[in-house]
A protein has these predicted regions:
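Gly/Pro-rich active-site capping loops and adjacent beta-alpha segments
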Residues: 89-121, 384-432, 549-594, 608
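Second-shell loop/turn segments in exported
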Residues: 90-94, 131, 139-155, 474, ...
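Glycine- and hydrophobic-rich flexible loops that cap the catalytic core of alpha/beta enzyme folds
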Residues: 349-381, 385-548
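Stable alpha-helical elements in mature extracytoplasmic
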Residues: 113, 137, 153-163, 340, ...
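Charged, long alpha-helical assembly modules
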Residues: 673-779
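Terminal end segments
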Residues: 50, 286, 587-650, 754-916
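Hydrophobic alpha-helical segments
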Residues: 506-608, 662-665, 676-690, 697, ...
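Substrate-recognition/specificity elements adjacent to catalytic centers across diverse enzyme folds
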Residues: 2-10, 26-30, 34-329, 334, ...
């Protein structure tokens, strides 16, 4: 079906426009007829092509390599549950079934992780490939597979690859997915066989998207060119430990044993992490380099999310003493980029009889292209994940000299390699990748990064600038790890001890792991490779020529924070600080999320259990949908006190009277407040930051958000300054900015509250005047976008979700985008709310990141657990399961989640038998 889009330009064409419109409609008609008729190029798009790529879900298929029959049972949403009698058969079948539904997604992903996108999409992807080759994810993955992964993990990866290749056998692109037919118009690309390393490489891409504070590190360095230390501190306030609780509030670090004890309620004391000085290259050269690097990072494709404040998640567990069932309930909803298909693939992997030959009985969310279950439950335990945000990357300034780099006064040779990038429809390109002892030189991959100014200022301790400094990256994922081992170990863990042992293998990305089991235990642990630094705290680039800034190792696993059965009876993780820095000796990061969501979840749980109340599965679901605006609670009382003579602005101001701060899709008050908040950020910070951090782009005349409101003389195009990609620098309006504004409100005459006059709109010299100006600007912004009549305003008209195919849905021909994309949907929720349908205040109100899935696991009866995905099981645009879960996701509904064989049988719609 075509997209259910309701967007309109709002432009009224004249005679010439009508002619163009007729031509456009004629072109669409011709293309549609080509699709139906299957003539000429339209043969690629014909109904037969579409049907050829849809998976067989009934009957039987013979697969060479199976040792016994495998049953694939799908429910009415196309979600598969696989039953086998050996581990190898189970994972081979997983590879086959995921390829049936999602191979195009898998293929694009492996080309991204290996820096080979140009082989599929041509010269437009060469720059991305150059950067990705420099990072070398596939090389690290290959080394990881060869040297660090266990024999059993390799066996499972091989079985999975065998299943994918069994699906590919005898098929060309158009038999696999509609997208290949589109690619066939422009190049002769053919899918190649899947390898075990393709699966391992996916973990590197995931780690990159969840890498932590690199953007903050760049931003702070850029700020030093214009702002003083106190101003930068204003924009990066300390974490509010006294107001927003960290994850771990019980237990202590034992200085004598060098271990953390999270099993009791005692409190510990120790010193905070070391903070060292940083490099002093503060002139135009460093600014140019870092701004260029920021642009490169912004342009890179993402694997699971956006680069920036949107990466987050909620996961919490409530112990049996506080639940209706008397057993734990565990909720999870990772916040990632809105993608089509969803990054998650729901699946069950069941051994008919659990034994040493067949060890798995697990269900949950998987990544297409990787065996095992990433988040979910087995017959004994359940677990969820949120991004920990710990700092696992550092940027180093490198002094280059000839064919080497300076290190402790000595010139060392680069480690170099030559990479060949093949380009569809064009000539191959060779690049040389250079590495220092710290890591690859990112500055080799962008022209801006090599424009090192001759006048760059450095302190007297730095080496002579010569031709300037390069930038290298030190990152934990550049070292071979064991995360793939961890996935399989988690999937079969039966208790807390086995869960903890499995988690120690989860090297990268570092995640907050939340745990519950059927024996009424709950827990939390922080695994991962987290560096210890000789000097520096990871907040700014440091001199690579001085070994005092080298990493000295990783925090010992036994010293990492955890909690087991805390006295309060629940654990909440939502990207807040893991532990109070004054109670822990190691530096985890300087850039936590600020705890807005986590504290709201904590308050919701506490309000429910105060006085002996009990929590149900549906209570957990309702908490996931909470869309209360915490920044509105802070600002609205101030806004209502402002005296505004303009009747139109007063009319909008009255929307805030009696507002309960919830951001429902139909709320006019939420629409107006969020516009005020966006304008506060623009006025207070937009003209005071270095130009490299300001919103990029020129002023544009953009269309109203949609035309679902009444047309009037104001509902025309509006001048919109500063549109930019959603994952660039501040001010994005996330909870860091909540904390910035909260603290600045204590000083209403701060220079941050000044803004110049603009046209007929007044300037401001204090907080109240700036708030007044923001209210005026917001009134006229929404008048232009939604119409003059505020009775027609709603948050959902501004805050809309579009789902776009990950490649051709953004850059393909218009007719292809029309076929592949879906939307819009009007959403409730907002930035830094529990229902985190995030938007970027610098770029508009559209939904950028979302709860990519939601689940609530019932440890009393797994068959009463609930789950939902953002889209559907299928990656095929004409499948009934392409977006069949999206409507329910939008409405906050969850689907039944069958686990027992009886429940699975009762919910089965189709059964496919894979035979040896």
């Amino acid at each position: 079906m075509p997209p259910n889009t309701t967007a309109s330009s709002g432009h009224k064409p004249g005679k010439s426009g009508r002619k163009k419109g007729r031509k456009a409609r004629l072109l669409v008609l011709v293309l549609v007829m080509a699709i139906i008729g299957g003539i000429a190029y339209g043969a690629y798009w014909s109904v037969s092509t579409v049907r050829a790529s849809l998976p067989q879900t009934t009957g039987s298929i013979t697969l060479d390599g199976l040792s016994g029959p495998v049953d694939v049972k799908r429910d009415s949403y196309g979600i598969p549950q696989i039953y086998a009698s050996s581990d190898a058969d189970l994972f081979m079948a997983q590879g086959y079934v995921q390829a049936q539904d999602r191979f195009y997604e898998m293929d694009v992903r492996r080309h991204m992780t290996s820096g080979r996108l140009s082989e599929m999409f041509g010269k437009s992807q060469v720059k991305d490939d150059e950067f990705l080759r420099t990072l070398g994810w596939d090389r690290v993955a290959e080394k990881e597979y060869d040297t660090t992964l266990s024999a059993s993990t390799k066996k499972y990866l091989q079985a999975y690859a065998k299943g994918v290749n069994a699906y590919l056998q005898g098929k060309d692109g158009k038999d696999i997915s509609l997208e290949y037919a589109a690619l066939g118009f422009t190049n002769d690309y053919k899918p190649e066989k899947w390898t075990p390393v393709d699966s391992v490489s996916w973990l590197k891409a995931m780690a990159w998207d969840l890498r932590g504070n690199m953007q903050d590190e760049i931003d702070r360095a850029l700020m030093t060119t214009r702002l003083g230390p106190q101003q930068i501190a204003d924009l990066y306030p300390d974490y509010p430990y006294s107001r927003n609780e960290p994850i771990v509030t019980q237990g202590e670090y034992d200085e004598y044993t060098k271990t953390f004890n999270g099993g009791d309620g005692s409190t510990g004391s120790s010193t905070s992490g070391t903070t060292g000085s940083t490099s002093s290259s503060s002139g135009s050269a460093l600014t140019s380099q870092l701004a260029g690097l920021s642009n490169v990072l912004d342009d890179l494709p993402t694997a699971v999310g956006v680069n920036g404040q949107g990466i987050g998640s909620n996961s919490w567990v409530v112990g049996g003493e506080h639940t209706i069932t008397g057993k734990p309930l565990l909720a999870n909803d990772p916040h990632l980029e809105a993608s089509l298909p969803s990054v998650w693939y729901q699946m069950g992997l069941h051994c008919r009889t659990v034994s040493s030959k067949c060890q798995y009985d697990v269900t949950g969310y998987t990544f297409a292209g990787m065996p095992g279950v990433v988040i979910g439950h087995n017959q004994d335990i359940a677990w969820g994940m949120t991004n920990s945000g710990v700092d696992t990357t550092d940027l180093y300034l490198e002094k280059l000299s000839g064919d080497g780099y300076l290190n402790d006064g000595t010139t060392k040779p680069f480690t170099s390699r030559t990479e060949t990038i093949k380009v569809a429809g064009g000539a191959s390109k060779k690049i040389v990748v250079r590495e220092t002892n710290n890591g690859p030189l990112l500055s080799d991959r962008n022209d801006e990064l090599v424009k090192v100014g001759k006048k760059a200022t450095v302190d007297t301790a730095a080496p002579d600038r010569g031709d300037g400094y390069a930038i290298s990256l030190r990152w934990t994922a550049e070292d071979p790890g064991t995360t793939m081992d961890a996935v399989f170990a988690l999937d079969k863990a039966s208790d807390w001890s086995e869960f903890r042992a499995a988690s120690t293998k989860f090297d990268v990305p570092s995640q907050n792991l939340v745990y519950a089991d059927t024996k009424n235990n709950i827990g939390y642990t922080l695994p991962g490779k987290i560096p210890m630094r000789g000097k520096g705290d990871g907040s700014l680039p440091v001199p690579g020529w001085d070994s005092k800034y080298d990493w000295t190792g990783y925090i010992p696993q036994a010293a990492l924070p955890y909690e087991y059965n805390p006295k309060r009876g629940y654990i909440v993780t939502a990207n807040q600080a893991v532990i109070d820095k004054d109670k822990y000796p190691y530096t985890l990061t300087t850039d936590w999320g600020y705890g807005t969501r986590s504290q709201r979840i904590t308050d919701l749980i506490q309000s429910k259990i105060d006085g002996g109340g009990k929590i149900s599965t549906d209570d957990m679901r309702q908490m996931q949908l909470d869309d209360s605006s915490e920044i509105a609670k802070l600002l609205v009382p101030k806004l209502l006190k402002i005296d505004e003579p303009d009747p139109d602005v007063r009319q909008a101001q009255k929307l805030l009277e009696g507002w309960d701060y919830t951001q429902d899709a139909d709320s006019a008050a939420a629409a107006y407040f969020n516009s005020v908040w966006r304008n506060i950020l623009k006025l207070a910070f937009g003209n005071k930051l270095p130009k490299e951090l300001r919103v990029k782009g020129q002023c544009l005349f953009v269309s109203p958000v949609d035309t679902t409101g009444p047309a009037d003389e104001t509902n025309q195009k509006v001048r919109e300054c500063g549109e930019r990609d959603a994952d660039q620098a501040q001010p994005d309006g996330g909870d860091r900015w909540f904390e910035v504004v909260r603290k600045l409100m204590d000083d209403p005459t701060s220079d941050w509250w000044t803004t110049p006059k603009s046209g007929t709109r007044p300037g401001a010299s204090n907080m109240n005047q700036l708030f007044k100006r923001a209210m005026i600007d917001a009134r006229w912004e929404l008048t232009a976008k939604l119409g003059k009549d505020i009775d027609t305003w709603s948050w959902g008209r501004l805050h809309r979700l579009f789902l776009k195919n990950q490649t051709l849905g953004t850059e393909g021909p218009a007719i292809v985008q029309y076929i592949l994309n879906r939307g819009p949907w009007k959403l409730s929720g907002g930035e830094a709310t529990v229902n985190a349908t995030g938007w970027n205040a610098a770029g508009g109100y559209g939904v950028v990141w979302v709860p990519s899935m939601r689940m609530v696991v019932n440890l009393d009866n797994f068959d009463k657990s609930k789950w939902i995905n953002l889209t559907g099981a299928s990656g095929h645009a004409f499948s009934a399961h392409y977006t069949d879960q999206t409507g329910k996701w939008v409405n906050g509904e969850l689907l039944p989640w069958s686990f027992s064989s009886k429940a699975v049988d009762n919910s089965t719609s189709d059964t496919l038998v894979l035979k040896p």
